[in-house]
Amino acid sequence: MPTINQLVRKGRQSKVVKSDSPALNKGYNSFIKARTDISSPQKRGVCTRVGTMTPKKPNSALRKYARVRLTNTMEVTAYIPGIGHNLQEHSVVLIRGGRVKDLPGVRYHIVRGALDTAGVDGRMQGRSKYGTKRPKAAKK
């Protein structure tokens, strides 16, 4: 326990808050070729690799992911949500924050229905999360 005098001389250090999605907190100025501290809710990037990985125990599946080089020159691993996708190498995608609990190192999600990513086909519920357009009304 510190004395009052010790606290007066050197106060308590505040805790450092670590970001859940650090790649969204950095920008890039291409004129001076330097990183900036401008943050954004989403970022655009180009897929460098698309594949599947297996989740941690006790889950079992083949989860789809993409390695994405962002416009701020960082490279991150992003999860591809939904059933089926049209992504391949050099596809331009939009990523948002949000980790996948059973995939280590995956801290980002790809936004379905934006840029080169198509929405999920035949989806009726939760369409806005998967970039699916409203189905046409059936004729009477």
Swiss-Prot record:
GO MF, any single term: structural constituent of ribosome
Q: Any one cellular component term from GO for this entry?
A: small ribosomal subunit
Per UniProt, the ranges with Basic residues bias are 130-140
Report whether Phosphoprotein shows up as a keyword of the record. Answer: no
> Is the Nucleotide-binding keyword given for this protein?
no
A Pfam match is Ribosom_S12_S23
Residues with 3-methylthioaspartic acid modification: D102
**Function, please?**
With S4 and S5 plays an important role in translational accuracy. Interacts with and stabilizes bases of the 16S rRNA that are involved in tRNA selection in the A site and with the mRNA backbone. Located at the interface of the 30S and 50S subunits, it traverses the body of the 30S subunit contacting proteins on the other side and probably holding the rRNA structure together. The combined cluster of proteins S8, S12 and S17 appears to hold together the shoulder and platform of the 30S subunit.
Assembly mode? Part of the 30S ribosomal subunit. Contacts proteins S8 and S17. May interact with IF1 in the 30S initiation complex.
What is the similarity comment for this entry?
Belongs to the universal ribosomal protein uS12 family.
Provide the protein name. Answer: Small ribosomal subunit protein uS12
Organism, as annotated: Exiguobacterium sibiricum (strain DSM 17290 / CCUG 55495 / CIP 109462 / JCM 13490 / 255-15)
- Taxonomic lineage per UniProt? Bacteria, Bacillati, Bacillota, Bacilli, Bacillales
